[in-house]
Amino acid sequence: MKTLQIIKQDQDKIISLVEHETTHTKYIQKELNYYDKTLYQTLQKIKSPYLPKIFVIQENDNHLILIEEYIKGKTLDQQSFSKDEVKDIMHQLCECLDSLHKLNPPIIHRDIKPENIIYHDNKVTLLDFGIARFLDSKKSKDTLILGSVGYAAPEQFGFQQSNPQTDIYALGKLMNYLLNGSLEHQNNIPLDLKQIILKATQLDYKNRYNSVKEMDLAIQQKLVIIPPLNNDTFKSKMISLAWIVFTLMIVADMEPGETIKNSFINKLSCFLFIYFGLFLYYNKNLFHKHMSKVPWPILYSIILFIFVCLDVWFFMWIDFLI
């Protein structure tokens, strides 16, 4: 391996960008002075899209040498994000941590912060397991005070043992930072997301979410917008409500000579058609996230056309039954 760059060096580790001399493939090489070999062997076996692959684990003169996958992209502290992007990042991190927490015993990362997370092409990668550890049910508290100030949970300062809720605390702090650019202030955060952050960052770990899956569910429930019920802002709620009222006013009157039955069916069909367009508009980022390469103007037209066809067929069938 040829060393291209020393990324980080301190008394605990040396992290380098290296290149294979034959294939010219780039890797990350880590030389660790303090380590848990079993933990890295466990990480090597985990098949997760959110963790860098570990190709080599080798002990050499009281050092542990790791050769890991090189991940391109910037860390979270080098970027800014919309609310929808933050929700997506948190969703991916919850899935990543769930794969660690469901192990027996669970692995606790203990150092979740923007500098340890790469976000590239809408994909999250969690890095730096330098202070990660297995949960030890026999211990009542951590023996060493480790973690990053601002993201470390109270139990990391020697009050109790680190546990899965320790990572949940850091996720809450991270979410606050990504939404507002600060660890403390919550000025511009919507109420529903603020409540998630407050629950995740409770001082007593027993009052936090029971698992990252539970926290993810709380976030996921806000990913799909049902206008005007759960729009992110008061302004968008009012716009949605006004649009719905306006639509109802347009379709309210019966045409001369039209029966009540046919009028109801036609007007309801018209309203559902327009509301479906409103639903697509407010959830466009969610659809774009999962299908980023789709030509959306064409797809929207196709979806609306299919909806109209189904809509007409459905109400003709109801009309026949009535």
Where in the sequence are the language-model features?
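Conserved HxN/HPN-centered segment at the entrance to the catalytic loop
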Residues: 47-57
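Conserved catalytic-loop aspartate of Hanks-type protein kinases
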Residues: 167
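Conserved HRD-motif arginine in the catalytic loop of eukaryotic-like protein kinases
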Residues: 208
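Conserved activation segment of eukaryotic-like protein kinases, specifically the C-terminal portion
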Residues: 141-155
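Conserved short submotifs of the Hanks-type protein kinase catalytic core
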Residues: 61-75
